[in-house]
Swiss-Prot record:
The gene is vip. PANTHER family: GLUCAGON-FAMILY NEUROPEPTIDE (PTHR11213), VIP PEPTIDES (PTHR11213:SF5). GO terms for cellular component: extracellular region; neuron projection. The keyword Transferase does not apply. Belongs to the glucagon family. It comes from Scyliorhinus canicula (Small-spotted catshark). This is Vasoactive intestinal peptide.
């Protein structure tokens, strides 16, 4: 169970990082 929670949080963080990179590329 803890493994699934970790994966869920990790994927959420990955999405946030991807969004930040996308916004930075737009602003660059």
């Amino acid at each position: 169970h803890s493994d699934a929670v970790f994966t869920d949080n990790y994927s959420r963080i990955r999405k946030q990082m991807a969004v930040k990179k996308y916004i930075n590329s737009l602003l660059a």
